[in-house]
Structures are given as C-alpha cells and as structure tokens.
Swiss-Prot record:
Protein name as it appears in the record: Enolase
Cross-referenced InterPro entries: Enolase, Enolase-like_C_sf, Enolase-like_N, Enolase_C, Enolase_CS, Enolase_N
SMART domains assigned: Enolase_C, Enolase_N
Superkingdom of the source species: Bacteria
Residues holding Mg(2+): D241, E289, D316
Predominant location: cytoplasm
Cofactor: how and how many bound: Binds a second Mg(2+) ion via substrate during catalysis.
Role noted for this protein: Catalyzes the reversible conversion of 2-phosphoglycerate (2-PG) into phosphoenolpyruvate (PEP). It is essential for the degradation of carbohydrates via glycolysis.
CDD domains: enolase
SUPFAM superfamilies per UniProt: Enolase C-terminal domain-like (SSF51604), Enolase N-terminal domain-like (SSF54826)
Length: 432
C-alpha cells in the first residue's frame, strides 16, 4: 500500500553551516523518501516564510527545532494514513492546516521537506525515477546549466555589486559535454585569476570571489572562455543575477546604489536599464535575473519593452515562484522568464503550478538552487520532469552544487538516446 505510515523530521546542517530541515517519509509497504530543504541568503520580500527558532543561544537564532517539531506533530498527525500518490491532496492538506498566505504558521521549510519527501516515497513505491514520477513518460529534455563562476553581492565579501556572473554552455551537444565545457571554463578562470594575483577562494555557490569591479568580472569571464578554447556566444553565453533589490536604496527609495563599489552615486531605473543595454551590446549576455527592485512593477514593464526581445529577463525576487505575482507580470508584460525555487512557495504542487503557468504564457522557467544547499539533488530531477530547459545550480566546486550536475549526468545516461540537450535552441528568440 502507498499510504503514509510515518513522517519524521530532524535538524541537519546546510552548506553554509546553518541548520535546515530533513524529512523522512515511510509508506506502509516500506517504500521510503527523504528530502533536505534549501535556504537563501538573498531572499525576496514576498517569499514564503521559513520557520526559525530565534534562540540566540543556539545557532545564532537560526535553529529549526520548531519546524522539526511541527513536522513530527501537526503535519504528521494530519498526513499519516493519506495516499502518497496523491501529491496534490497532500500539499493541499498542509496548506489548509497552515491557513496563511505565506506559510507562517507551519513554516515553508517544514512543509517543503514533507512535500518533497512524499514525492520521493511515491516514486520509490512505483519503482520509477523521481523525474519520471513528477513528469510522466515523455520527459527527455536536459537543462542548459547556468553555472555561477564569479560571486558578488551578498554571496561574497568582495567589491562586486552584482550577485552572480554565470556561464551557459549553449554549444554543447549533451549534458555531459555541457558539464565538461563549464568545468573547463571554471578552471581557465581560476588560472587567470591566480596569474594576476587575484583570490581563487570560492563563495557560497562555488564561484570565485575575487576583488574586481563589476565589468572586470565580465572581462575575466570572456578571457576564460577563450582560454578554454571555446567561442563566446557560439559555445558559451553569459547570464547575470543582479539581485537588484539588494541594491535599491531603501532610505529615500529613489534609485539604486552600488553599495560595494560606488556608494556615493544613485542610479535611476532607466540608468540601470541603459547599463544593461551597454553590457548586452558588448558581451554575450543572454539572461539577466532581477535587474530591478522587486517592487518596481513599472520599471519592469519598461525594461521588458526595451530589452525583452534581446535577452531573457528572469524574475526571482520579483515573482518568488508565486502564481499570483506571475499572473500579474504576464498581464502587464513584465519579464519573459521566471526563476523557480521550491522553498519560495513551500510545496511541490505549487512549484509545478508556477512552472506550468509560465510555460503556458510563453515564459521560460529556470529551476534554481539556493545559496544554502545540501547534498539533495531534487531540483535536478525536477528540471528534467518539467522540461524547463534551464537549471541554475552553482559552480563546478562544492559537493552541494556538484551533486546536482552529477545527478543530471546520471539521468542523461539513463535516458540514453532519448535524452535531448537543446543548447542554443533554448535562446533562439534572442538570436542564439
């Protein structure tokens, strides 16, 4: 039987040394699923709420024993006996039990751990891979990686204001080749930085964190692509996560400041747009994430009008994997893509709903990790299951990041000749 027999949570540690929630779900026939919940550093104002203990004497207040207790009592009492194959009903039951818009009663971290673990247990019961259980029998598309190779913003202690500088191996013929190309650019960049006396230590997501200015980061990536024997734009493109809500001046709310490199200058939304235009014309940039503040709806409409046919504009903090915010963005013409983070919304079902809404509207969807990760590679299966065609899961270092790439290569091997890596076709509408 596929009935849920036992749900048990525990506190574990994520890649930043902070506590997070791990959940085990056992079914009545012995089938089993386990999931670990990620956590973000740069978080959107409208994300579902993580439940933290707030006890400053323990993990600086970041413990998750309350969330663990919630899983082991309220959630377990509600879900035990339900059919694990009914993912929608399980997630709906937790949402009803919570009763809030932002998951503040149970905590999104508690709910997500259970939701993911139930999906894994159901897949185990059916004897199918997780991607097959979530996506059905016709899912063969492998995602193009967005690999973070230079960290800035909140993810590092350097002077780079923008949070992530990433490479996308669009010229690869397979997932395995995409990983190889990305790794070779990563190592080429390390060599260039070391030769110039720059730091080669890595940030939260495995990318390097040298003390450069924003445009120098782009220049180094261009050199690394060439040093790896690859061609910019043909083989490898660049993607940015600007995390501009972190740059927005909350004091007078008039514009943006490069707090690390040039805190004395204030940039308007139009000046930010003009900067992106300049960079897009100069570098092989194919995707820009969170280019403006999460509350700047008018700015996003204008930016999309000016750049939406030239580059992928990804809403992360702007959409927070929330179908309500996404529906408004679609209606108003804001962005043309959404970043998908499971813990921004708190259940697998709501995550799938957001992806399907985006795809039905002609928006791209990019499955994403968080800066605080674990060895759990759920998002690798999710990207294949939902055929999003893109995944953002960090650099070619740190086992918490590499775990996802390794899982994608395993999936590709399992799919064999049926596997499809679209590469440049993913960005055909932007001239790639």
């Amino acid at each position: 039987m596929s009935d849920i027999a036992c749900i048990e949570a525990r506190e574990i540690i994520d890649s930043r040394g902070n506590p997070t929630v791990e959940v085990d779900v056992s079914l009545s026939d012995g089938s089993f699923g386990r999931a670990c919940v990620p956590s973000g550093a740069s978080t959107g104002e409208f994300e579902a709420l993580e439940m933290r203990d707030g006890d400053k004497e323990r993990y600086n207040g970041k413990g998750v024993l309350k969330a663990v207790g919630t899983v082991n009592t309220l959630i377990a009492d509600t879900l035990e006996g339900m059919d694990a194959l009914n993912q929608g009903e399980i997630d709906h039951a937790m949402r009803n039990l919570d009763g809030t818009d932002n998951k503040s009663k149970l905590g999104a971290n508690a709910m997500l751990g259970v939701s993911m673990a139930c999906a894994r247990a159901a897949a185990d019961f059916l004897g199918v891979p997780l991607y097959r259980y979530l996506g059905g029998v016709h899912t063969f598309r492998m995602p193009v990686p967005m690999a973070n190779i230079i960290n800035g913003g909140k993810h590092s202690d350097n002077k780079i204001d923008f949070q992530e500088f990433m490479v996308m191996p669009i010229g690869a013929a397979s997932m395995r080749e995409a990983v190889r190309m990305t790794a070779e650019v990563f190592h080429a960049l390390k060599g260039l930085l070391a030769a110039d006396g720059k730091a080669t230590s890595v940030g939260d997501e495995g990318g390097f964190a040298p003390d450069l200015d924003n445009e120098q980061a782009l220049e180094y990536i261009m050199k690394a692509i060439a040093k790896a024997g690859l061609a910019p734009r043909k083989d490898v493109c660049i993607a940015l996560d600007c995390a501009s809500s972190e740059l927005f001046d909350e004091g007078d709310r008039r514009g943006y400041k490069f707090w690390k490199s040039n805190p004395g200058k204030l940039f308007t939304a139009q000046e930010m747009i003009d900067l992106y235009k300049k960079w897009i014309a100069t570098y092989p940039i194919v995707s820009i994430e969170d280019p403006l503040d999460q509350n700047d709806w008018a700015g996003y409409v204008q930016l999309t009008k000016e750049l939406g046919d030239k580059v992928q504009i990804v809403g992360d903090d702007f959409f927070v994997t929330n179908t309500g915010r996404l529906a408004r963005g679609i209606k108003e013409g804001s962005c043309n893509s959404i970043l998908i983070k499971l813990n921004q919304i708190g259940t697998v079902t709501e995550t799938v709903d957001a992806v399907r809404m985006a795809q039905n509207a002609g928006y791209a969807a990019v499955i994403s990790h968080r800066s605080g990760e674990t060895e759990d590679a759920f998002i690798a299966d999710l990207a294949v299951a939902l055929e999003t065609g893109q995944i953002k899961t960090g650099s070619m270092s740190r086992s918490d990041r590499v775990a996802k790439y390794n899982q994608l290569m395993r999936i590709e091997e399992e799919l064999g000749a049926q596997a499809r890596y679209y590469g440049a076709k993913t960005f055909e509408r932007f001239g790639c």
